[in-house]
């Protein structure tokens, strides 16, 4: 809640204590851990043009990375009920995409999508119904997460908790 103090001008952004762990999602359907790995964004097109240079200030991510969860909401398009999206098309920003794009994380998301589709058919539930009342608990979402974990597709790293701020061992 210290962010409100920044908005009101009581403290500077530099005075905030930055989180030492990734965001925890109640609708997690998988996990990943990979360094941010940006491909260069070139000034001119085609990118192979001799003498072409990276666009200044475009690469970020020189900081530490932490394990992260894959939220189901990132797989559900806002206007299409009968589709789950994973892989390079998952709904993440370009910073997150630099880590999501590797195979092991795409496999985790793909396994989650397949399990979610099967679960939805078995229970007569649309995937969006599993997340529409977040952060409130949803019994069907909890059942899906139990199935994912039982199938060997974990939804959280050991000791994942909003109270655990010591993720230094995971860097």
Where are these regions (language model features)?
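Flavin (FAD/FMN)-binding glycine-rich loop and adjacent Rossmann-like elements that form
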Residues: 1-171
